[in-house]
Amino acid sequence: SIMKMDGSQQEENLDVISTGSLGVDLALGVGGLPRGRVVEIFGPESSGKTTLCLEAIAQCQKNGGICAFIDAEHAFDPIYARKLGVKVEELYLSQPDTGEQALEICDTLVRSGGVDMVVVDSVAALVPKAEIEGEMGDSHVGLQARLMSQALRKLTGHIKRTNTLVVFINQIRMKIGVMFGSPETTTGGNALKFYASVRLDIRRTGQIKKGDDVIGNETKVKVIKNKVAPPFRQAEFDILYGEGVSWEGELIDLGVKYDIVEKSGAWYSYNGAK
């Protein structure tokens, strides 16, 4: 189709879904993850990738949205999801057998126009059918990359048309023999890097302790790529075990940053009230 950009066809305001973290929403520049786009969230193990996605699902459901979770890792924990505010009984959950099946389900959900957000956890676990049916030790070079490339070619048009947010969670691998620059790379080839409108790099930077007990992680998110606002912004927040993103802690930190809350030593005060 051909259209004139006179405003009659195109919505100029971007629809977004909050990530459940104030800092990340601000870092994204548009107030959340953009709908009608592909988003990639990657990082090391136990850095908070799935937690951030579940927080976003909870926010989407709060606003009446319908969400789907394609659990290729077969590690979805409904009890933890419920603690983060996810309405598990309203969540579409799929645990596919092969990578092809997972991406086919994703395509069907997107094309239906009946869901607002689809999360694929994770790209690394999308195993091609040939690899599952083959023997251990067989070489399947580039199969997963080809699978992702083909799927994203098919998906992007449908995603834009139905205004669905599709989030791919990805893991990190090390490239061998890299002398300069970062040896880190994400799995599943290069296609996702190109098709993603937003790429978030999430890292655990420290532990939160109460006495001797570790009760959570200090987390840092970098916006590595952003097609809807300026990239390379950062956000730091706390993820508490069994609770998710510490909303109060983030609010106070942002208050200090923008001089709304005063900090003196270990005390915080707002309008004179400590």
Curated annotation (Swiss-Prot):
CDD domains reported for this sequence: RecA
InterPro entries assigned to the protein according to its UniProt record, in alphabetical order: AAA+_ATPase, DNA_recomb/repair_RecA, DNA_recomb/repair_RecA_CS, P-loop_NTPase, RecA-like_C, RecA-like_N, RecA_ATP-bd, RecA_C_sf
Pfam annotation, one family: RecA_C
GO MF annotation, one: ATP hydrolysis activity
Entry keyword Cytoplasm: yes
Gene Ontology terms describing biological process: DNA recombination; DNA repair; SOS response
Cellular compartments annotated: Cytoplasm
Residue positions binding ATP: G43, P44, E45, S46, S47, G48, K49, T50
Keywords recorded for this protein, A-Z: ATP-binding, Cytoplasm, DNA damage, DNA recombination, DNA repair, DNA-binding, Nucleotide-binding, SOS response
Principal location: cytoplasm
Top-level division of the source organism's lineage: Bacteria
Record flagged with keyword ATP-binding: yes
GO CC terms: cytosol
Functional description taken from the UniProt entry: Can catalyze the hydrolysis of ATP in the presence of single-stranded DNA, the ATP-dependent uptake of single-stranded DNA by duplex DNA, and the ATP-dependent hybridization of homologous single-stranded DNAs. It interacts with LexA causing its activation and leading to its autocatalytic cleavage.
Listed NCBIfam families: tigrfam_recA (TIGR02012)
Family that this chain belongs to: Belongs to the RecA family.
UniProt protein name: Protein RecA
